[in-house]
Amino acid sequence: MKSEAKDGEEESLQTAFKKLRVDASGSIASLSVGEGTGVRAPVRTATDDTKPKTTCASKDSWHGSTRKSSRGVVRTQRRRRSKSPVLHPPKFIHCSTIASSSSSQLKHKSQTDSPDGSSGLGISSPKEFSAGESSASLDANHTGAVVEPLRTSVPRLPSESKKEDSSDATQVSQASLKASDLSDFQSVSKLNQGTPCTCIGKECQCKRWHDMEVYSFSGLQSVPPLAPERRSTLEDYSQSLHARTLSGSPRSCSEQARVFVDDVTIEDLSGYMEYYLYIPKKMSHMAEMMYT
């Protein structure tokens, strides 16, 4: 049984190999193999000589290889061997989560401006309204309603603001902005639009700019400064180390160089090396051991 199977396999190999040989005339001779096969396969000639057919055999039968046909054609990517994480650069997070009312009005304005000319000033197309209303009344009501909030929300050009009196501008901005909305730059700058900052050459009086935090860095942990008791223990440790080195026999250099380091610092160090210097975990651990 085994020998028969082997013969069959060899025959299939040879037929596959011979199928690959394309004659110059364009006919493919599929020749029979061995004496065991009784039936001779007919020789197929190309029907039209003007277009000689060149048939590409499938990849599986190249060089007589009997590869199984690949069922899943798209191969999934191999799993990463190394256990180190895929690192991404640190992100910048914008702190002002509360969108101010003015910016939302601006967004609304940009949405209402649609490409067709009828709704250029925020006038929605007359299909939405009942046919009874005349277009004139539509114009009067709708533009009057929409243009007013837009005037308050759109930041003015300097030429425009010179024309309009500054007191009116400050009143409008003061009314539209509340204390909760002062978390973004636009609103704060609008609030200070009327009167220029008076602190030139003096200590700055504009408190609102000081409280504003714009970007926070989500990378390294912000380690709080050492508490006073911790600081004192650090000083004691360094003093005792110094006294020991002076009085007793000279210690090894590594012991003299060893500094008081707590676990948090070590963790930060290793994290820094892994995530910012892209050193894999094992190596960063070794470096930690060297530093401590």
UniProtKB/Swiss-Prot annotation:
Keywords: Phosphoprotein. Coiled coil: none annotated. Residues 27-175 are annotated as: Disordered. It holds the Pfam family DUF776. GO terms for cellular component: nucleus. The modification Phosphothreonine is found at residues 143, 233. The keyword Phosphoprotein applies. GO terms for biological process: cellular response to hydrogen peroxide. Residues 65-83 have a biased composition (Basic residues). The keyword Phosphoprotein applies. InterPro entries: DUF776. This is Oxidative stress-responsive serine-rich protein 1. It comes from Pongo abelii. The lineage of its organism: Eukaryota, Metazoa, Chordata, Craniata, Vertebrata. The gene is OSER1.
